[in-house]
UniProtKB/Swiss-Prot annotation:
Specifically catalyzes the decarboxylation of L-arginine to agmatine. Has no S-adenosylmethionine decarboxylase (AdoMetDC) activity. The record marks E75, S76 as: Cleavage (non-hydrolytic). This is Arginine decarboxylase proenzyme. Binds 1 pyruvoyl group covalently per subunit. Heterooctamer of four alpha and four beta chains arranged as a tetramer of alpha/beta heterodimers. The lineage of its organism: Archaea, Thermoproteota, Thermoprotei, Sulfolobales, Sulfolobaceae. Keywords: Autocatalytic cleavage, Decarboxylase, Lyase, Polyamine biosynthesis, Pyruvate, Schiff base, Zymogen. The active site is at S76 (schiff-base intermediate with substrate), H81 (proton acceptor), C96 (proton donor). One of its GO terms (biological process) is arginine catabolic process. Is synthesized initially as an inactive proenzyme. Formation of the active enzyme involves a self-maturation process in which the active site pyruvoyl group is generated from an internal serine residue via an autocatalytic post-translational modification. Two non-identical subunits are generated from the proenzyme in this reaction, and the pyruvate is formed at the N-terminus of the alpha chain, which is derived from the carboxyl end of the proenzyme.
């Protein structure tokens, strides 16, 4: 699913580009590796040509377990949340930067997590 979603919309008035999705059947060891996921999101920031402001990551316990990683970038954010019990993750990449590429960040993270299947969506977050 590597279609160029962003190219399907009129880019003259785009204020925000939002690529998000669900990733299924991922190795649970990866989904609980906070350091790996933290570094993965850091690299995605670079690949998408975004400017990092701050990044936070944390494990959460309980029955479902998992990790959350949030990168605050000048252009907006990248958020990755995992659930080890379900071998599942959600990924949200939003940018209002003209030169940043949220789809590149999304596809890079997917390539490293290697889900058996995933869904990718695009939302044009423009003013009109």
């Amino acid at each position: 699913m590597s279609s160029q979603l962003i190219s399907l919309v009129n880019t003259d008035r785009i204020i925000g580009k939002h690529v998000f999705g669900n990733l299924y059947d991922i190795d649970p060891k990866i989904l609980n590796d906070k350091d790996f996921l933290h570094n993965l999101v850091l690299e995605a920031v670079k690949i998408a040509n975004m400017k990092l402001v701050e990044i936070k990551s944390w494990n959460f316990g309980g029955k479902k377990g998992g990790v959350s990683v949030i990168a605050l970038v000048e252009e907006s954010h990248i958020a990755l949340h995992t659930w080890t019990e379900y071998n599942y993750a959600t990924l949200d990449v939003y940018t209002c930067g003209e030169n940043s590429n949220p789809q590149a960040a999304f596809e890079y993270i997917v390539s490293q997590l290697k889900p058996k299947r995933y869904q990718m969506f695009y939302a044009d977050r423009s003013s009109e």
